[in-house]
Amino acid sequence: MSRKRSPTPSRISEGHPFPLGATWDGLGVNFALFSAHATKVELCLFDARGEKEIERIELPEYTDEIWHGYLPDAHPGQIYGYRVHGPYEPDAGHRFNPNKLLLDPYAKQLVGRLRWSEALFGYTIGSADADLSFDERDSAPFVPKSKVIDPAFTWAERPPVRVPWDRTVIYEAHLRGLSMRHPQVPEAVRGTFAGLMNADLLAHIRRLGVTSVELLPIHGFVDDKHLLENGMSNYWGYNSIAFFAPHPAYLASGQVNEFKEMVAHLHDAGLELILDVVYNHTAEGNELGPTLCMRGIDNASYYRLMPDQRRYYINDSGTGNTLDLSHPCVLQMVTDSLRYWATEMRVDGFRFDLATILGRHPDGFDERHGFLVACRQDPVLSKCKLIAEPWDCGPGGYQVGGFPPGWAEWNDRFRDCVRAYWRGDDGMLPELARRLTASGDLYDQRGRRPYASVNFVTAHDGFTLRDVVSYDHKHNEANGENNADGSDHNLSWNHGCEGPTDDPEIRALRLRQMRNLLSTLLLSQGTPMLVAGDEFSRTQQGNNNVYCQDNELGWIDWRLDDEGRSLLAFTQRLLALRQRYPILRRGRFLVGEYNEALGVKDVTWLAPGGEEMTEEHWHDEHARCLGVLLDGRAQPTGILRSGEDATLLLILNAYHDAVSFRLPEVAEGSGWTCLLDTQRPEDPLGERYPFASEFLVGGRSFLLFELQPPGAGAEG
């Protein structure tokens, strides 16, 4: 394709094709934009308010598919956008339209909000030719613009937090939802990065005992048109349009450095920051969506298109389009974005939404995909925590256990199994044993470690913990979709009444079941993830899909009742136990095999009679009580030597009635000390039970015992 070169204007010079984006060097700004199929790129400069286009300059050079130029008099604060010329041939995958002002994919800051208008679309709305038509209206008045920034920031000299995986406990939270109703956060900064710097809020997170805050998407995103028309918004933010820029509404100060200040506060509190990132699609939607950025820059390069009908998009994301990470420049954009957040912004890790897409070739998922390989070998990214949501909406999209070494994965099988077990479903013990021990059936391969299993019983997507035990069915009417949205696969149980109740027996059982679910989550092998608010029984009133509820339904209510305070204290105890006992977070998978050299098993599964579980026990569909003996003498590493951990016994009883459980035989003078009982959470603990005692395990309860050697004092 031939490209016309015009004389270089006096105020712009050739510049450089690298780095991509707008880069200030102290004297001017270098602009560089990838487009393999464009014929001309115009840089549009705007006034200080971002409202009036004051100049349009053609980028003078084209090197290795990068359009570039240098403005010696430009500086931070300059607001800009691009108009990209080229063929408008949707059937060939090209949708260039210079009437549409486009965001820089590498923009570090956004200015303004998107205002929905027919001018946003590259085609004429209502035309009989649909997206094959061509719209000539200027979209500039309706779109956010890019802004040049000065990245300078003075970081305190402190070592990185770098919490070891075996000590990691993830706290999944929505930035806005965390602080919007927090009474100690000043109203002016609620819902922003500055809000998360609040000392009282950080103190709560720190006292809770978690180590790593995982924020739902904070990249610049777009509110869907249909949501705005119905008085709602895209609260969760899984509709990204700018992978290098924080969402403007989250900047109380209007300055990007506010994000860095938040990171510094988290790190000062000893907390890691993990970002939930959405690199699988963009807010531009399908062929009938708006032209905001990549569609107008180089649609055929950025997106996966149907091979025989390039007018249409492959939709493995379920949102209308799918980014093509098999294209080297798209792969570069994503890895550049990750490195930017990890280095310039000092983020500690990433959770990848619909991560299967990031490893897709045309033939399906491949763990040797360029993106996954790049993350593993990159000197920056390989040191970050990398967490996959290991599924997408495409064929073969469910890849739990399929990611390569170096990755952790959301383990939805843990969630489903644990919920089903405590609900009282039959036949759950064999799978429960696997999930309690970090799902070795999924992850014990190629040197992967137990931390690869990110265990959760709730996530942002679905019921809260309280709602899991309070509702049989979702109640999403507030979303305006006739309760059709959100999953029906909830594995929940209302315990006799749908929703709130004053019945004291139901309330007590629900609270105990929440303690059971939390105990199973936080005392299992693997990496636990707790959702913000679950620690004190937050409810969403049965709505399991609050993606559009930027209001009190989606925000955390920090006003705690007695039940909330009780559950919070219990959760803090659980997390303290997890950190106190290394045997609850081992670096090796528990296999249950007898080690002849040491004379112990790392894990022994016990029936209520105290005997080791047999095949008959495992295949008893109605069995609902299980003991898990973790021997502290078991080999903790690859070196043949005895461990020096405590020996613990976990007993889980999902029967409605109490069960007599014979505690394991121990040496004379030793005994079992009860550390935790979800039926008696506030009773004095430390009661000691002697050799081979019979213990009455309450119905629907979880217990934790520690083996005390002869002469040892009871644990208080």
Model regions: which residues?
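Carbohydrate-interacting/catalytic domains
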Residues: 1-171, 176, 193, 205, ...
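Conserved, mostly hydrophobic/aromatic
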Residues: 33, 82, 173, 215, ...
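Short, flexible loop/turn elements at secondary-structure junctions
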Residues: 35, 61-63, 73-75, 86, ...
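A generic secondary-structure signal for well-formed alpha-helical elements
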Residues: 78, 86-88, 177-182, 209-217, ...
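Core domains of carbohydrate- and sulfate-ester-processing enzymes
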Residues: 86-154, 225-233, 239, 269, ...
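Substrate-binding/active-site clefts of carbohydrate-active enzymes
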Residues: 139, 174-347, 354-380, 397, ...
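Structural recognition of the beta-strand scaffold that forms the well-ordered cores
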Residues: 169-172, 212-214, 242-244, 349-351, ...
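Conserved alpha/beta catalytic core and glycan-binding cleft of carbohydrate-active enzymes
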Residues: 361, 367-532, 537, 545-549, ...
